[in-house]
Amino acid sequence: MSETTYFGRVITAMVTPFTVEGQVNYALVEKLADYLVTHGSDGIVVCGTTGESPTLSWQEEYELFSIVKKAVNGRGKVIAGTGSNSTSEAIEATQQAAKLGLDGSLQVVPYYNKPPQEGLYEHFLTIAKACPDLPVMLYNIPGRTGQNMTPETIIKLAAVDNIVAVKEASGNLEQTCKIYCHTPENFAIYSGDDFLTLPLMTCGAVGVVSVASHLVGEEIQGMIQALLTGDAAKAIEINLKLFPLFKGLFCATNPIPIKAALNLVGWEVGGLRLPLCSLSPELEEGLAKIMQELALI
C-alpha cells in the first residue's frame, strides 16, 4: 500500500441495527451505511466492537459484510471485523471477507488467552500471509483484551506488506509517538477514541475509527481538515465543542450509549444482545441533554 490514508481519515465503527425480535435489521443496515458515507465518513468498520461482533454469528457477519459493501458502492472503504482469539478462525473469516470484495480487515489483539508478544506477532503475521491481497488494520485495545500490544511488536508487524495500519485505543500518547517514529511512512495510525483524535494526530495519527461519527461525522471531518490545513485554533474549537458528546458516548460500555443516541435521533437501531443491556434512564437523560445542547435532538 503506497497511500498512508488508504482507509481515509474518518472511519465509522458502525453499529449493528436489530429488530424488536433481536434479529439483524439488514434493511436498516443498508440505509445507515449509505447515510454514513454521505455524512463525513471515508469508510466503515462492519462487525467491530461497536457492531457487537461477539454476539453475531459468522453467517450474520458475512451477510453484513456483503450488504455494507453493496450499500457503500465504492464511495468509501469497507473494513471487516474478522479478528478472533483463534488464529485459524480469524483466517477463515478474513478469507471470506476477501472473497466478498471488502477493502480491508480489522484484527483485534487476541483476548482471554493472553498470548505473549511473540504469540501476537505470529498470530497477525499468519493472518496477513493467509490473505496477502487484503490490507490489515491491527487493533490494540488493552481495556478489552487484557493486554497491550507493545510498540515493538507493532513496529515489527508494520514491516509486513499488507499490514498497513493500527487502530490505537491504548490511550497512550507516548506509545503512539514511538510507533510513528519507527514505522514506514505509509503505515497509518488511527485513534481508537474520539476524544483523543486531535492529540493523537499531533503525534502522527492520520485520523480516527470513530463512534461519534454516526452523529457528527461531518464535524469530525471538519476538525481533521482544519488541523491538516494549519488552522489549529479551528480544530481545537470543534474538538472542545464535541468533547462532551465524545465522553457522553462512553458513559457506559460501547455500544450501549451510541445505540441509545441513535434511537433518540430516530434511527430505531433497536436494542442490544445480551450480555449487553440498555442504557439506564439516568444515563440516557444525561446523554440526551448533551445531544440537545448540540442541537442533535
From Swiss-Prot:
Question: Does the record bear Cytoplasm in its keywords?
Answer: yes
Q: Where is the signal peptide?
A: none
Key words, A-Z: Amino-acid biosynthesis, Cytoplasm, Diaminopimelate biosynthesis, Lyase, Lysine biosynthesis, Schiff base
Binding-site list for pyruvate: 50, 209
GO CC, one annotated term:
cytosol
Record's catalysed reaction(s): L-aspartate 4-semialdehyde + pyruvate = (2S,4S)-4-hydroxy-2,3,4,5-tetrahydrodipicolinate + H2O + H(+)
Q: Where is this site: Part of a proton relay during catalysis?
A: 49, 112
This protein's pathway reads: Amino-acid biosynthesis; L-lysine biosynthesis via DAP pathway; (S)-tetrahydrodipicolinate from L-aspartate: step 3/4
Enzyme Commission (EC) number: 4.3.3.7
Name its cellular compartments.
Cytoplasm
User: Looking at the record's lineage, which domain of life comes first?
Assistant: Bacteria
Predominant location of this chain? cytoplasm
Q: How does it assemble?
A: Homotetramer; dimer of dimers.
Family (UniProt): Belongs to the DapA family.
Q: What is the protein's name according to its record?
A: 4-hydroxy-tetrahydrodipicolinate synthase
Recorded source organism is Microcystis aeruginosa (strain NIES-843 / IAM M-2473)
